[in-house]
Each structure stands twice: as C-alpha cells, then as structure tokens.
Amino acid sequence: MAIWWMGWLVVMGTVAGAVAQADFQGATHMVPFEEDTISYNKTPSTGPIARLQSRIDRGEVKLKYDPKSGWRDSLLEALAISPKSQTLVFSKTSLQRERITPATPRAVFFNDDVYIGWIPGAPVLEISEVDAKLGGVFYTLEQTETAQPKFVRNNQCLECHASAKTMGVPGHLIRSFKTDDQGIIDLITGVSEVNHRTPFEDRWGGWYVTGTHGKATHRGNLHGKAAFQMAEEKPNFLGNLTSLKKLVDLEGYASPHSDLVALMVLEHEAHFHNFITRLHYETQMAMSRYQHIRYLRSMGEGFLKYLLFTEEAPLKARVKGTAGFADHFASLGPKDRRGRSLRQFDLEARLFKYPCSFLIYSEAFDMLPRPMREHLLQRLHEILTGQDTSPEFATLSPETRRAILEILRETKLNLPDYWRAESVSGAR
C-alpha cells in the first residue's frame, strides 16, 4: 500500500476498475477542472494549509524548527494532527522516492482534511490538504530553518494525482504492491485503488503494519522475494506485529508504530475525499449546463453506498492497533447525549460501530452545491428512517439505521427540519 501526492501514491489491493465503475457507472473520465466552471489552477485554496499560512504571515502562529525532524512536529501540532496517526510506507512511491527504502520509510500523518509526509533527511515535507471546493491541493515545505516558512503549492503533483485512479479529479489514492528489498514496486502484483471495500488480505503491500488481526492475513511488512516465499509457507510470519524493532530502526520518527487501525481509517478517508470532490465538480458543471442535477442521481446513490459502508469488506478476525490511535480518534466525537459517535470503532466484524462516515461532518460535505447536498440529505433520511427498503442498503439493520439517525439528529448541524420528525419505519 502506498500514497501519492507530490508523486504520492497510497498503495494497496486488486479491485481497481471495478471500484471506479461501481462508484460512477464507469465514468472515470477526467473532469475538465481547468475550464472556467472549476478553474482549479487559477483558484486560490481556502483549505487548512492556506489558512495556516495566513496565520503564520500575520504572526498568529510561529512554527518551531528542529535540527533532526525539521518542521514536522511543530506542523503536526499547529494542524492538530496526532503522531498516533503515523503510518509508514517503504515502497518508492513519492516525489522523493530515491530517499525511501525499507530502512528509511516515509511517515504519513493525517487528520480529517490534511496529509503530511516526512522522510528522514529529505529536503521537503510533502503536504496535501482537502479544499472544500477544489479537492486535493498539494504543497511542499522546505526543511530549512527560516523565520517565515512558506508552503509552496505544486500542481506538478497532478501528473499522478488527477487521473481515472483518483476518480478523474485532483485527489489521493491508496494501493498495494509487492516490493523488492529496496522498496521498488512490482507493478504486476496489484495496482488498484484501495478503500474499505478491499479484502483485508489484499491490503498494505509496501507498508509497515503494527497491530493484531488473528488468522487474517495482509501484505504488510513484506519486501523482497524471500519474504514473500516465506509468507506462502507461513502466511502470518510477519503478521500480528506489535513492534517493528526487528524490521527497522525508527529512531528519529515521531512514533515507533504504523498503526493498523490508522491505516484502515486512512484508506476509507482518501477515497471518500475523491468521491465528494467528483460530486462537487459534476454538480457545478451540471448546474452550469442544465440548471438541474437529474443526470447525477446514480452518482449520488454510489456516494450514499460508500458513506454508509454498504459494500465494506467484512473483517475475519478482531483487529487492534498499537499506537493508541483508536482511542484518540474515537475521543474526537461529536457525541450524542448517550455518548454515541460515528467515530466509535467495532473492529470485530467491521471498521465502525455505526457505519456512516465521520466525514459527513466535514467542510467538504457541508459545502457541496446546495442541490446536491439537499438531495443527499433527503435520500439519507429516507434510508435511515426505513422508507427506503431497497436491497442496496439491506446491510443496514433497522437498529443500526435508527442509531445513526439519532446520532446525526443530535450532532449534525444545519439538517433540514424534516430530520427532526419521529417517523421511523421498521426501526423500533
């Protein structure tokens, strides 16, 4: 598994074309985002990195430089990104790929709308934000001490980060490759977008993984022909690791972990961001051309299926991370009066206890063009209240629908008034 931005590739699995077709009925063509309707390159970002730069320029925030880690730790703190989110990728899939090896993996940190990549000794930090209107926006930050650090927007990244694999919009992708002992990827072994629908056993090729997962297998921690041959004889000989000390020296890294649960959240999140960017772009273009979104209804249904995890690959064993990421993430809320939250994990049969994406609270969702946002909220209400009994959402039990509905009623701002009504069919 690996991440591209600035040449980042988030690598994992084997279901590429099928995923894209399921999402957009095969419409993986590039969106003309350089044209006036979107005007990606000409439009300044208003995302988290752009806002942080403004605060730095006004003197409201001062980043601290460390001789060993550069701006890394101070930047994580300024953006409220926990070091517990660290995941480690050793496949050579980055702008600075020559510096990445199994001995010097790239550390990837993230929160709901920012990704940061750090490589020991590398000249720049690789940074990506999710702008609510533009989607993925990519930056570098020179690892040189200065009184006024500057994030430099780099559209060169779109050579990899705007393709059918990112749903035709500026975005991110997670994939899984076998690598040799130097981290060079084998493109034949599975070049596919990975998210919560990908079977567990196909994930994390090219990544280190810490955490327990019973008899279930994955591709993590393996590099070189000998390791993969051993994995055929003893499938979990590098699985269920709670420490990476025998595999790599992580002195100087923010954490000694590459948390399994953090990886699972990362792969869900990256594809969600691409999905919502595509919806945003398509809605803008449809309204410009037709003044309606009737042609986008099937795309909306695909998004709702992803939002509600209806095609999630079931877990075959209980999984547990090692960095404390799960507890940190779950604590972020928001919570209803009963203490329930969409960030609560299950980790036995599925990722989340209440399968509705926490990113429904995101700025990107709230800033969808009004016709699309209203349509999605209406359809979501129909599903959660049991008015929609279609087989596409049959994986959601009446009890689960009711719980999600109650959580959203108490925690999601600016819901339409009809969401407050008590009519719930078959969910008592």
Where are these regions (language model features)?
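Generic N-terminal helix/loop capping motif
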Residues: 75-82, 86, 306, 310, ...
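Exposed alpha-helical structural elements
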Residues: 47-51, 67-75, 243, 302, ...
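N-terminal alpha-helical interaction blocks
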Residues: 24-122
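Bacterial N-terminal signal peptides
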Residues: 2-16
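Sequence context surrounding c-type heme c attachment/ligation sites in exported
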Residues: 117-308, 351-427
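Substrate-recognition/cap regions that form aromatic- and gly/pro-loop-enriched pockets
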Residues: 308-377
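Boundary at the C-terminal end of the N-terminal hydrophobic targeting segment
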Residues: 17-22
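A short linear-motif detector with a strong N-terminal bias
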Residues: 65-69, 104-108, 153-157, 186-189, ...
